[in-house]
Amino acid sequence: TYTEKDEEAQTLCVKLKDEVTGMVLELLYTIFAQGGIITRSARFTNEGTSLVHLLNAMSLSLDLPDKDYVWMQFSGAWSRERHVKERRLEQGIQSVGSIRGNSSHEHNPFIVLRRPSATENAGEVMGFSLIYSGNHRMQAEVDTHDTTRITVGINPQNFDWKLDCGESFQTPEAVVVFSDKGLNGMSQTFHKLYQKRLARGYWRDRPRPILNNNWEATYFDFTEDRLVEIAAKAKECGVELFVLDDGWFGARSNDHAASCTEPSVIQYK
C-alpha cells in the first residue's frame, strides 16, 4: 500500500537488534486515517560479520485474548476459486497456504475471523490479507489458555533466504481490517483501500487492457486460419492482445505429451 498525502497514514518503526548475531529487525506498523486499517511488515538487516540464513520471516503476528471466533477461508480449485469454508477456532493449529510458487486458486492469501454472532451487516469482524502472489501461509494457533495467535506471511516451507553482511530482506505487507459493522463493513474497507492505494500509476483509475486466450476455444485442435479468425473477432470486440496457449510447440497434442521449444509446423498448416 502507499499514500499520496502525509496525513493519510502514520507509520511506527520498532527496531530490535540481536547483539550476538548483529541481526536487526524492524517492525513496521502503519495506521491509516481512513479507520479500521493497520498494516504490518518486517525488515531484516544483517549488521553482523557472517552470512545468515532466514528460514522464517512472517509479515504479521497478532495475539488475541480469546478464541471465540469463526475462522473463514477462501479455498477452491481451477475454475471454482474462493469458496467460503468456516469452522470455530479450537485449541491447536489451523492454517491454509500455498507452496506452488504462487498464491494459487486453492487457498487465497486472505482469511477472516468473525465473532459467532456477526452477520453481513453487524458484529465484529477482522480480515487479514497478504499482499503477495507467492508461497504464503495464514495460521491461527490457540494455546492451552484459549488465547489466539495469528501469523501471516511467506510460507516457511522451503524458504531459505541467504542474507550477506550489509544486506536487507523486506517481507511483503500484511493488511488487517477491523469492522464492527459485519462482513460487509470489512469488505467495503478493503475495497476502498485497494482501489485507491494498492496499484498506482496510469491504470489505477482506468479500465485495464483486454487480452484474448485461445485455449477454451480450441484446446489443442487449431490451425493458423482458425487462430486468425478468432483474433479478428476479438479485435472487433475491443481486445488488444491475443495469447496463443498450449499446443503450439513440438508434438504436444494432449496432456500426456511432452513439449519442446520448437514450434509445431504441423499445427500451422
Language-model segments: which ranges?
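Primarily single-stranded nucleic-acid-binding OB-fold modules
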Residues: E141-D146, T218
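Short acidic, Pro/Gly- and aromatic-enriched capping/linker segments at domain boundaries
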Residues: D146-D164
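Short Pro-Gly-centered flexible turn/kink motifs
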Residues: W161-D180
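Terminal connector regions
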Residues: V177-P209
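Aromatic-lined carbohydrate-binding/catalytic grooves of carbohydrate-active enzymes
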Residues: W203-K269
